[in-house]
Amino acid sequence: MIVAGGTGGHVYPGIAVADELHRMGIRTHWLGSRHGIEARVVAGTAIPLSLVRIRGLRRGGWLRWLTAPFIVALATAHALIVMIKIRPSVVLGMGGFVSGPGGVAAWLCRKPLVIHEQNAVPGLTNRLLSRIATRVLEAFPRSFPVQVNARCTGNPVRDDIARVGNAALETSSEGPLNLLVFGGSRGARKLNRVVPAALSLAQSTLGQFTVLHQCGADMVEETRVAYRE
């Protein structure tokens, strides 16, 4: 069972692992959140999907923090029900807020729990789960303290991305400069504000250029306004 959700940084590496396991003849089941992109992205694949109701806490304000213990308890109970029904041999937590309830459910069911951290600085969920995990994997060396005994594996990459990386990159000094602004799967508000202003100041130096700005589905209009201003 793969437990991951929230953003593409957790979901797409999980899909890469699921694809490789499928090629090896190993069945997978995905446990995610109804509010994360996995509800759309994983649902569009052949991976069986179960969803629990839980959101991240960092941007929820004091009310969400106040109700957090109840929300986490309910999500853990739901994850436990799914775990008992699916009966996975191993649970792989790839991060995101849903990994907390999923990891605890795996521990309660006495299932081997493997967690993978994609970032140089581990998130809160993986820091907590590292205390009960059977094996801890990290993309960057020394992300976890030495006593965790994490194994550095790098980040899983999907085959379609790897194939693009091996292709020759054709560039030309002629024509306008092409700039890609990428703020992650959900965008980055700070980039959405700073980059348009910076490009406005640098326009005389850069000359003609084209910008493709990945701003996040929820911030399209405010980013358009920033460029117009």
Where are the regions that the model predicts?
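Conserved nucleotide-sugar phosphate-binding/catalytic loop shared by glycosyltransferases and other
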Residues: 2-5, 22-74, 217-219
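Short amphipathic alpha-helix
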Residues: 10-21
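Hydrophobic alpha-helical packing residues
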Residues: 21-22, 106, 202
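Active-site-proximal region of nucleotide-activated glycan assembly enzymes
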Residues: 27, 37, 48, 107-167
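Short internal beta-strands
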Residues: 27-33, 137-139, 208-216
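Donor-nucleotide binding loops and adjacent catalytic segments primarily
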Residues: 36, 41-45, 166-229
